[in-house]
Curated annotation (Swiss-Prot):
Pfam families: CpeS. This is Putative phycoerythrobilin lyase CpeS. The lineage of its organism: Bacteria, Bacillati, Cyanobacteriota, Cyanophyceae, Nostocales. Covalently attaches a chromophore, probably phycoerythrobilin, to Cys residue(s) of phycobiliproteins. Keywords: Lyase. Gene3D superfamilies: 2.40.128.20. The gene is cpeS.
Amino acid sequence: METKVLMNITKFVANSIGHWRSQRSAHHLAFGHFEAVQSEIDIIALPHDDPAVIDLCKSYNIDPQTVVSPFRMTWEGQSDWDDSEIKGTCVLVPIPDPDSPHRGKLLRSRLCRNNRCRGDYYFTEHGTFVLVTAYERAAAEEKIWFVNPNVRCLCVSLIKTSVRFSELLLPHFLQKFARIFRIKLYMTIFKSYRYKLRACSLYINAIALALPCHFFINTGA
């Protein structure tokens, strides 16, 4: 008997559209500092014939007709520790697998220092969205699911590097306040570079639980 998958990319994106006000807290072990970041995040649906969607598809030689539920994410915020500008925007384009609609690829523009990147996604039988993105030296696995229509929770990225070095992965807690409450977890990746420890924040919209952790959801007014 075939297992029924509770979520698909169209429903997932529809549930994610909206304006978010976020508060993210992080503990940077390398510097012994707690950081608080406040930001505003907007996710809006895009038409299939949007020029940004067409250009992103062309860059991967993908037929724009195969696109489902493209959207744009824009964020702007400030940190109580780092004076660097926290601001950006990117276009995300899901491409479902025609033979397996609960799997596919996710094209993303202007993500992390790269002009674009592509990840592979799938939905578990419980409705969890899982995205795996390969980078030059690492691969990030991200997960996200909805506890109910009003709560989206837990985003953690697990980074696996090709370099034999013990990395410290620290999840961040991010609670989204809007008309509905959403929670994400982000993480800071610490790695060795010329025998020094550098901190690198991975800011991704979308995303998941890869490490055991506890979390709490405040659904009050």
